[in-house]
Amino acid sequence: MLQGGVLCKTGLKRKVNQDRAGMLADGDTCLCYIADGMGGHYAGEKASGLIAQSLTDWWDGCHEAARRMPLQELAEHFKELLDGCASQLNREIPEDEYCGSTIVLLWLNGGQYLLLTAGDSRCYRLRRG
């Protein structure tokens, strides 16, 4: 069984936390993500919030079937989900504004992993400490 935790807090510059993080686990399957809304742009919290909600909804409806998918196919599913978030945001924000979010997504399943990133957020692998 996988165990972990998530902590996300508002920084010193902004009054609104534009970041979202989550860990969704079921046995030896886990989806972890960090979505970092783009500061200085319109509604970064909306972008990261949409990604977080979309991943949670996906988990609730699809993670059981995804356990059996080849990793390349699963990567395409996640890419389509994130592209859908971007399209939805582009429809909802004012035409002269821009908003977005970075994403680090880690899927762990039975000893295999899939890592997807977009933007300047990072994932580090630590060994022995």
Q: Can you name each region flagged by the protein language model?
A:
Residues M1-G129:
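PP2C/PPM-type serine/threonine phosphatase catalytic domain
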